[in-house]
Design a protein with these regions (language model features):
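Beta-strand->loop->alpha-helix junctions that form or flank phosphate-binding loops
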Residues: 73, 200-201, 213-235, 255-260, ...
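ATP-dependent carboxylate-amine ligase catalytic core
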Residues: 31, 36-39, 65-158, 204-207
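Nucleotide phosphate-binding/pyrophosphate-handling subdomain across enzymes
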Residues: 135, 140-145, 151-164, 168-172, ...
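C-terminal helical cap/extension that packs against the catalytic core
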Residues: 203-213, 218-222, 237, 306, ...
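Acidic, Mg2+-coordinating active-site environments of NTP-dependent enzymes
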Residues: 112, 137-144, 160-253, 266-284
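A glycine-rich beta-strand to alpha-helix segment
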Residues: 396-426
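Hydrophobic alpha-helical packing residues
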Residues: 59-64, 133, 379, 425
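Short functional linear segments
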Residues: 1-48, 55-68, 73, 109-116
Length: 432
């Protein structure tokens, strides 16, 4: 990693220290200073509470299978910032990252000289992604919202080809509202007049909000319900499913994942592709592409029988629990969370629904991390199984590996936890 790259990353990480939230007028002005690179892209805009990253990865893979040049913008990153900007399936290189950073920073300086505020952390990276995509000749850009949708910086891209809304749950309530309906309203804020909408069935309240928004904005709208596909089984750590749809034929689809929630995410992406390409599309190529997708931090096997899952809200933990297979040997849970999440409910759900005979807790390295002892006490209130408290993720991860003994290990509760664990493994690999 070059010194220049380190300096660029440090600058971006320091942005929250001297900026505040800007409105969409500011984001549009920022993009205008960059030459409005988003206007040269065919954008697929994705919002939702859970599953956004997976849907984006599936869309990107199928677009590439169609021979399209793609850009993928997602957040957060788990280990390196480059993960957020992907060109034709490859993370942007350090050199290209630095080149785009310098171009964006130069325009930011011009904005500041004109009396305008500095872009936020997320705005800056969004601008970098749009410029990187334009410079690379990207045709289709898959863009994931950062938080919510209505006021999200990505909503400054005003002309998407299609809008996708994944499952909606209770998360970020301090910003998005304290009911499913309010949160759905924020997510539905990315819906543009006349732009087709595909959304995942969640509950009647969120469905009603999305349907009403599409009616008001005269959009084609399609709901992807759980009755639209059938899970056929899990074999060799792949999940197989079929679709109740003649377009796909009598075909079995496979995903390189054991999460029972992933077929719904895949079908949401598939139906969006079907709308875009119709009879000119190649579902057989999509099938091959989907089977090869590995999306980090979602039931991702990082070592033999060791999985990380970014579930960090109650609905995601419920979906995770449904995906854990029964095991005669038992399972080990490694858990951590940030203080402002409803971790008590998450822990109660785990203890109630997952067969585990050992729980290990730790405090993540981020300042927002919940204390390990506090997490341990909550587990002890909900289980009579052993609860081991370790102050650092590194010590906790070492402990579960030493005590695995043929059992599956599942690490969840925070994307910060997922990133720390993946970072530890990368460090070991680099030393070998």
């Amino acid at each position: 990693m070059s010194r220049t790259y380190e300096v660029a990353v440090k600058y971006i990480l320091d942005i929250p220290r001297f900026t505040k939230k800007n409105d969409l007028v500011h984001t549009k002005t920022f993009l205008r200073y960059l030459g409005d690179p988003q206007e040269d892209l065919k954008i697929l805009h994705v919002a939702g509470t859970n599953g956004k990253g997976s849907v984006c990865a599936y869309l990107d893979a199928m677009l590439r299978a169609e021979g399209k040049h793609t850009g993928l913008f997602t957040s957060p990153h788990l280990v390196r910032m480059n993960e957020r900007i992907v060109l034709d399936g490859r993370q942007i290189g350090d050199e290209s990252f630095c080149q785009v950073f310098e171009e964006v920073l130069s325009k930011v300086r011009e904005m500041q000289e004109a009396g305008m505020p500095h872009p936020t952390f997320f705005e800056f990276l969004f601008g970098m992604a749009m410029l990187a995509f334009q410079k690379a000749g990207v045709e289709y850009a898959v863009v994931e919202t950062g938080l919510g949708g209505r006021l999200d910086a990505t909503n400054a891209a005003e002309h998407p080809l299609v809008t996708v809304i994944t499952s909606i749950g209770m998360d970020h309530m301090e910003y998005l509202g304290d009911t499913i309906g309010k949160i759905a309203g924020e997510k539905a804020g990315i819906i543009r007049p006349g732009v087709p909408v595909f959304y995942a069935q969640t509950c009647e309240e969120s469905d009603r909000v999305i349907r009403q928004t599409t009616e008001n904005r005269h959009c084609f709208c399609k709901k992807i319900g759980k009755d639209a596909y059938e899970i056929l089984g899990i074999e060799d750590k792949h999940i197989a499913f079929s679709c109740a749809n003649a377009y796909y034929g009598n075909t079995t689809w496979k995903l390189n994942n054991i999460g029972v929630y992933q077929p719904g995410n895949a079908l949401l992406a598939m139906e969006s592709m079907r709308f875009l390409f119709g009879e000119t599309g190649h579902p057989k190529l999509w099938r091959q592409a989907l089977a090869e997708v590995k999306w980090g931090g979602r039931m991702e096997e990082i070592l033999p029988d060791v999985y990380v899952d970014g579930a960090h809200n109650i609905s995601a933990v419920e979906a995770f629990a449904q995906s854990v297979p029964e095991s005669a040997e038992g399972n080990i849970i490694l858990f951590s969370a940030v203080r402002d999440k409803e971790y008590t409910e998450m822990i109660a759900c785990l203890c109630r629904n997952v067969q585990a005979d050992l729980y290990v807790v730790a405090q993540i390295g981020d300042d927002r991390g919940a204390g390990a002892s506090a997490l341990g006490k909550v587990f002890e209130e909900h289980t009579d199984k052993p609860v081991i408290v370790r102050e650092s993720v590194k010590d906790a991860f070492r402990y579960v590996l030493e005590h695995q003994k043929g059992r599956a290990v599942y690490c969840l509760g925070s994307l910060y936890l997922t990133g720390e664990i993946k970072g530890l493994i990368q460090e070991v690999k680099q030393k070998c």
